[in-house]
Amino acid sequence: MSDNELAGATALVTGAGRGFGRGIATALSSAGAQVVGVARDRAALEEVRAALGESFTPVTADATDPIVAGQLTDAYRPAILVLNAGATPLPRPIQHHTWQTFSRNWDSDVQHVFNWVREALLAPLAPGSTVVTLSSAAALRGSPLSGGYAGAKAAIRWLTAYAAEESARDKLGINFVSLLPQLTPATALGAVYTAAYAARQGTDEASYIGGLGLGLTPEQAGQAITGLVTGPGPDHDAYLLTGAGLRPLT
C-alpha cells in the first residue's frame, strides 16, 4: 500500500485513544489521511498525537453525544468515518447484573453508532465516503458474561445494514460496512474477557487464548480497515475480522 494512498482524505475515528481505535488511526495516518481522533481521554489522545504528529487532530469529546456527532460531521465532512467507541461491560453472569449494567452497551455503543450513522445520512457525506462500524464476533456467538453486549453488537451490525439500504435507496453513494472482530487479549476489553472466560472454563488464560486461534491485534484491525477504504470498496455489509484477516458474512 502506498504511504500516500489516502492523501487529501479526512478520516474520523471514534474511540481513537487506545486499542483498535488507536491502531486504526495509526494505519489511516500512515496511508496519508488526515485523521481526526475522538475520545474522552485527553491524555490518551495526546499520546496518539505525539506518535502521529500533525496528521492527527485530537478532539476530546463524548462520542455518544448526538450534538457532538452532528457538530463534528459538519465540521470535518470525513471521507472515512470509523465508529469504534464503546464501553467495557462488566464481566459477570446475567443474574449478577442490574438492568443498568446489562444495558450499558445499548446506551453507549448502540446510541453512538445510531447518532453518527444518522448524521452521515442526513448530512449527507460525499458520494464514495465509507462508514465503518465496529460490531463484535459476540454478535454471532453470544457472550454470557457480558450482559447485553452481544445483543448491542448485533444491533450495530443491523443498523449498519439499514444505513446501507437507505444510502442505496436515496442514491447517496455512501458505503456502510460493519466489522465483527474476534475476542483478543490485545485490547483492554479483550484482556478482561479472556481472563473471565478462562476462569469460567476452569483453565489458565494462556490455554484459553491459544484456543482462540491466530490473535488479532490493533495494528491488524487498522490494516484491514485501510485496505477496505483504499480498495474498490466493500462488497458486503459485514465481515468477520480475525488475525487471519477479513471474511465476508452473509
Where do the language-model regions lie?
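Conserved mid-core segment of classical short-chain dehydrogenase/reductases
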Residues: G86-S103, L145
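Active-site loop-to-helix junction immediately N-terminal to the catalytic Tyr of the SDR YXXXK motif
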Residues: H97, G142-A150, Y162
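Active-site helix of classical SDR
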Residues: V117, A152
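Conserved glycine-rich cofactor-binding loop
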Residues: T10, G17-R18
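Conserved glycine-rich Rossmann-like NAD(P)H-binding loop of the short-chain dehydrogenase/reductase
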Residues: A33-E47
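Residue(s) in the substrate-gating loop at a strand-loop-helix junction
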Residues: S136
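Catalytic Tyr-X3-Lys loop
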Residues: Q95-F114, V132, I156
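C-terminal helical subdomain
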Residues: I174, A198-T250
